[in-house]
Amino acid sequence: MENVAVIGASPKPDRYSNKAIRLLSEYNHNPVPIAPKHEQIEGEKVYRSLKDIPEKIDTVTLYLGQARQDPIISDIIELAPKRVIFNPGTENKAVYKQLKEADIEVVEACTLVLLKTNRY
């Protein structure tokens, strides 16, 4: 079981970040939602920032567009996950370089597809 930070988590069931939280749980992973304005999503405690997470994070799955990523990149690097998944619409070549320099694997893929095709 992996601890997975879901950055850009939404309480709205039609949002992909919400679907990822549910599917991660279904596949026996521990989703850790990150959202500044919510207390709980899909029964999971929500953290306002990456710095608030008490446990080790194995994977970060990103649901924030490029324009909103800069403020959190140093926090992701400090968190030192094994990998960061850039879901469709979050691609950011400049950030890829920073993460790779910090020995963090960059995956450009859909978390939902990775889980459903057993490639997670």
Task: Locate predicted features.
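Structural/interface elements that position substrates and couple domains in central-metabolism enzymes
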Residues: 1-57, 70-87, 91-120
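Short glycine-/small-residue-rich Rossmann-like dinucleotide-binding loops
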Residues: 61-65
